[in-house]
Design a protein with these regions (language model features):
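Alpha-helical transmembrane segments of multi-pass membrane transport proteins
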Residues: 1-424
Length: 424
């Protein structure tokens, strides 16, 4: 009965427009109050909500959000775009390849898909359209390339997943780096094919060693950040939380004193914006912790594990089923909400089937990113629409070849665990 109350209540509250975090908390409280078989007190929900945030790893989320906002406003994105363009040279579709590479570089700084779309799109979209690139294809490529944001570390969704499952944040970031490089290669290959098929323009800027070195030097402060973050974590010198705090300090130094495009007067609004974004994410995590605890306490998790195990599904088939479920939920729910709702339900089953926690984490992470590109809840498309001023339908039409490449690589990751684990 508790499970019916929880999921029916959660679905009903979402339908009538109640925020996700409140829906999780209210449905959990209602199940405790209405199911006579649940003997714990209602105030246990408050204890579990507090326990959901009582972790130093959770602090990394707020710091990474703040660091991403500081970098977006601090002039780093322009240096990243110039550096990416200096690498490509005058090939057909060169600016489109530049966009993909710029999104990959910026992803290693921000960890956010919408931030990547806005930061890179603001700089490159108008210039590409003036050069003769199709508006819909350019916007669509921006949407899908922005999906590198939560995959290439640092990644907020990976920190959330690691907190829920006990996985190593460092190992998640290593796997994410490998997956991110793979997706980048796939997108570049798709760009090359369509650049020749649709006769996209050649970049007028040819590769020049002097220009490359100048742009590289200008980009060093930006490129240093992922080295500091990932190097500190991989070497064991820093935890993810400590690295995220250092990322904030370095972002301030780069924006205020090196690039000088960030001003002290900007900081208050950046702090407020970051606090709001972090609070929404943390509230969802907190209430989902209580939801997941009651799910296990009522014995629903154990019953579900036994049911699936008795179906004799292979690990690959289960991973494929999970991928489809996550993609469906991601269409209607924001990415982190999908993860915090389903991971506590699905991970015990995956664990019973012997699925690697990092591989499962990559499935969850990539599926959540795909959700940012699929209407109606498609934050990447909304972000691209705000930059490009194009209608959503035109952006969706333009993104299909890149979206197919992204999703195709996702299913390869689902079925081939070594793609997730080769860097570990």
């Amino acid at each position: 009965m508790a499970g019916i109350i929880m999921f029916a209540g959660f679905a009903l509250l979402l339908i009538i427009g109640v925020p996700i975090a409140l829906s999780l908390g209210v449905s959990t409280t209602a199940a405790i109050a209405l199911d006579p078989e649940i003997t714990v007190k209602v105030n246990t929900v408050a204890q579990r909500i507090f326990g959901g945030l009582d972790s130093t790893s959770i602090m990394a989320i707020a710091f990474f959000v703040l660091a991403g906002n500081l970098m977006t406003k601090g002039g780093i994105s322009r240096r990243i775009c110039d550096f990416a363009r200096s690498i490509v040279g005058g090939v057909r579709g060169g600016m489109a390849i530049t966009l993909v590479l710029a999104c990959a570089f910026f992803a290693a700084l921000s960890g956010s898909a919408p931030a990547t779309v806005i930061a890179i799109g603001t700089i490159l979209y108008g210039e590409m359209c003036k050069m003769g690139y199709p508006e819909d294809r350019t916007a669509g490529l921006l949407v899908v390339s922005g999906g590198l944001g939560p995959i290439i570390p640092p990644s907020i969704i990976m920190v959330v997943y690691a907190t829920m499952t006990g996985a190593s944040v460092g190992d998640m970031f290593k796997a994410g780096m490998g997956i991110g490089i793979g997706i980048t290669v796939v997108l570049v290959l798709v760009v090359i094919v369509f650049a020749h098929k649709e006769h996209w323009p050649k970049d007028e800027v040819h590769f020049n060693l002097k220009t490359f070195l100048v742009d590289f030097v200008k980009a060093i402060p930006a490129l240093m950040l992922p080295i500091i973050i990932l190097g500190g974590i991989y070497s064991g010198i820093l935890t993810a939380t400590e690295s995220s705090a250092i990322a904030v300090v370095w972002s301030l130094i780069a924006g205020l004193f090196i690039y000088r495009e960030l001003h002290f007067s900007d900081l208050f609004n950046i702090f407020i914006e970051s606090a709001k974004s972090s609070a929404m994410t943390l509230f969802i995590i907190a209430t989902s912790t209580a939801f997941a605890w009651l799910f296990a306490y009522a014995g629903i998790s154990a019953k579900l594990v036994n049911f699936v195990v008795n179906m004799n599904l292979s690990p690959a088939m289960f991973c494929l089923l999970v991928a489809i479920i996550l993609l469906i939920f991601g269409t209607f729910l924001e990415g982190i909400a999908t993860a915090v709702l389903l991971v506590p339900v699905l991970w015990p089953i995956a664990q019973a089937l012997g699925i690697n926690v990092i591989h499962f984490g990559m499935i969850v992470s990539i599926a959540n990113v795909v959700g940012t590109m699929t209407p109606p809840v498609a934050v990447n498309i909304f972000s691209a629409a705000s930059v490009t001023k194009l209608p959503m339908g035109k952006i969706v039409h333009g993104q299909w070849p890149f979206f197919i490449g992204y999703v195709g690589f996702f299913f390869l990751v689902v079925l081939i665990p070594k793609l997730s684990l080769f860097l570990l």
